[in-house]
């Protein structure tokens, strides 16, 4: 499966590797686990997001 583009709905239970690019993470709203309608999205993270994502197995899919 290809990585999800920025703004796409992602699975908050999985790692940030599902989102495209080193700087993007799966961001979920506050108390998302308790709200049925809450969705997580791939959004730009902080500097340490890129550091944390260095070990992702699907890095070859990213261009940045």
From Swiss-Prot:
GO molecular function, one term: toxin activity
InterPro entries, per database record: Toxin_34 (IPR013605)
Tissue-by-tissue expression: Expressed by the venom gland.
Keywords from the named record: Disulfide bond, Ion channel impairing toxin, Neurotoxin, Potassium channel impairing toxin, Secreted, Toxin, Voltage-gated potassium channel impairing toxin
Record's GO cellular component terms: extracellular region
Known function: Insecticidal to house crickets. It induces an excitatory slow-onset impact that leads to irreversible spastic paralysis. It also modifies human voltage-gated potassium channel Kv1.5/KCNA5. Most likely, it binds to the voltage-sensing domain of the channel, suggesting it does not block the pore but prevents its opening at physiological membrane potentials. The recombinant peptide binds to the channel in an irreversible manner and slows down the hKv1.5 current activation kinetics. It is not toxic to mice, when intracranially injected (at 0.5 ug/g mouse).
Protein name: Kappa-lycotoxin-Os1a
Organism of provenance: Oculicosa supermirabilis
């Amino acid at each position: 499966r290809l990585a999800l583009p920025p703004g796409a709905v992602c699975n908050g239970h999985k790692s940030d590797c599902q989102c495209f690019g080193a700087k993007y993470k799966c961001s979920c709203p506050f108390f998302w686990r308790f709200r049925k309608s809450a969705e997580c999205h791939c959004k730009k993270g902080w500097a340490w997001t890129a550091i944390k994502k260095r070990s992702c197995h699907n890095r070859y899919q990213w261009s940045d």
